[in-house]
Every structure is written in C-alpha cells, then in structure tokens.
C-alpha cells in the first residue's frame, strides 16, 4: 500500500491545496464544501494529455507530476487502486466512469462519442446529464447547466464517481440525539448527533484530533472470507480498505487554521504524507463522549477562477492555450470546468457522488455556425508566404470592374 500512496502523492497535495482555495473563496465562506479531488484530478489530467507547451507545463505542475507520463501513471494508480470496487468482497461499492463527447464534425485524437453541439446543443446537454445521473445512481442529475453547451462547443470531458459504504461499526439509531453544533461565527444550530459506545481509532495531534471510521469489508481469498480480524490487520498493515477520517480542531473556530496548516504542508516535501502521517494508530481506544453529526452536503462550483489562482491560466487564455494534441486542425480553449459533489453520512454509512465536466470551445468560427463573407464593398488584400510571413503582394479594391 505504501507504493500506492506514494504514486498518489500529487493527488494528495492537490486535494489539500484545493481545499484551502475553496475555503478561502468568498462565495464559500459561509457554506459547506464537498468536492472530489480524484474526479477533478482525473479530468485535468485528461486535458493535460492533449496539451502542449506552457499549457501542459502548468497542468503537470499543478497536479504534482514530474512529466505527462508520470501524471498518467498517477491517474492510473488512483483509478485502479483508490477507486477499486469492493462490493463483491462485502466492501463499499465504488464506480467510476469517464466520457468524452466531441462535436461530430471534429477528428478527435482518438475518436470518442460524437454529438451535434452546433444544431442540437440542448439535447446534447441533456444526453450528457442523463449519462452522469446514471453513473452516480441519480445522486447527481445535472452537471451541465443551461447554456453550458452551445453551437461553439467543441468538446466536453466528463467523469463521474459513485460511492456507497457501510460502517464497520454502525452507529445505533436509538443513540442519535439532537445537540448544538457551533458555527464559525459563534452562533449555534440544532443538529442530529450520532453516538456510539464502541472503542474507536482516534489520534491526537498539535491543535487537532483525528477520528477514523472504517468502512465494512471482507478480505478476498483469505481463509473463509470472513471479516478482517486484528490478526489480519497486523499482517496486512493498517491501511486496508476504505475509511473516513474526520479532522477536528481543538478550538471551535479552529478550522481555517487547520486548513491553512494542511495547505502549507502540501506545498513542501511532505505533501504526499501529511494525511498518512496523521492517521490514528492501529489500536482502538476507549472513548467517553463520541458524537458525530449526521449530515448531507451538496456543492456545485464553476472552478475556472479557483484553478487560475492555482496556476493554470494558459488553458483558459485564448492567446496562450495549446491543446493541439487533442484535436486535429482546430484551435480550442477550455471554457468552463464545473464540479458537483454530494455526500450523505448517517448511522449506517456513507453515500456519495461527484462529477466533473470540462467544456472546450472553438477559438475561431469555422465550425461553430455558418458565417457569411460577401465582399460587396471595398476591401484590402495581401498575398503572404505562410512560413516566413513575407508579404508578396498587397492592395485594396475600390471597384472590381475598373483596371485602375
């Protein structure tokens, strides 16, 4: 498992830096935030696969990779290991789907799903949203809002993730009670709190505590296929299966400082190990008062400005973008990166889904819609050699019927 964690170090660092950016965004200052780092990471990596020059360099740097090959390997490991479905072995259900839709007149490298963005943008948008809804078990019914697909759309990259897992030790529903949840502004709100008398994995650190809530699973091809036992954990190590980690600052208003601390760590050499280094030990400990709120959080954001602030301006800049490795003979620019996520945590476990969509538009009008060019009034002309830009002839025409 250590190798897997190392290969996903760029993803971990990206997750912590993005958490900081989203927390600092003024629009999010008073609302819950949930996002899927792996969904966004995979979407941006797909854009990087068709990028060249500065556009590629910025994407690779943001995603914490040494090269495009290194980035592609990181994504492969994240999908194969981090998003591996464990439902057949009694563990969480995890599904991941990736789709690419391109304007039907394009020659994409390689070819993916074709769509008639020019003549049927609304139906194309609905078709993609329907695909996302199915991939997320209807938790996310729309990733592309009205107007996000239009006649000038060249390409839409989409991925979707669905997760459903039961706790290894569920919270008894009869122990759920209403209590005060203290918000950052000092006010409080009544919320349902889950509780348990079971021993728990809890780690104590400078200024914060960490609770680990493992999801139920069984070990494939091990003995009689029963539950993971302490002996199995000792043999395989602590990092077995999927778990939720709750980072709780000691101070009621300490979350911003904790997020800052994570972001600072993500920019250094220890970026890939911060979360790993702050996991509780492998022994459960007795707890007195254990209360975790039951919640459901949904979040939608157009990520352009956040991503620009993290260093990938060229992909959105018509004067700098280079995505020539993706589409033959056409200039395109990233128009929008949209992300939606939902997470529900209750006594039984967790159900969550996320989707990321990246739309690209043409830089010129050659394919967006038919245009008129009627030279029925005076015009200028130039005869230019393309490679050297040498102008061989130049002039203007005031009357095409006159020799002079």
Swiss-Prot record:
<dbReference type="InterPro" id="IPR000215">
    <property type="entry name" value="Serpin_fam"/>
</dbReference>
<dbReference type="GO" id="GO:0004867">
    <property type="term" value="F:serine-type endopeptidase inhibitor activity"/>
</dbReference>
<keyword id="KW-0646">Protease inhibitor</keyword>
<comment type="similarity">
    <text>Belongs to the serpin family.</text>
</comment>
<dbReference type="InterPro" id="IPR042185">
    <property type="entry name" value="Serpin_sf_2"/>
</dbReference>
<dbReference type="InterPro" id="IPR023796">
    <property type="entry name" value="Serpin_dom"/>
</dbReference>
<dbReference type="GO" id="GO:0005615">
    <property type="term" value="C:extracellular space"/>
</dbReference>
<dbReference type="Pfam" id="PF00079">
    <property type="entry name" value="Serpin"/>
</dbReference>
<feature type="site" description="Reactive bond">
    <location>
        <begin position="363"/>
        <end position="364"/>
    </location>
</feature>
<dbReference type="InterPro" id="IPR042178">
    <property type="entry name" value="Serpin_sf_1"/>
</dbReference>
<comment type="function">
    <text>Probable serine protease inhibitor.</text>
</comment>
<protein>
    <recommendedName>
        <fullName>Serpin-Z2B</fullName>
    </recommendedName>
</protein>
<dbReference type="InterPro" id="IPR036186">
    <property type="entry name" value="Serpin_sf"/>
</dbReference>
<keyword id="KW-0722">Serine protease inhibitor</keyword>
<feature type="region of interest" description="RCL">
    <location>
        <begin position="349"/>
        <end position="373"/>
    </location>
</feature>
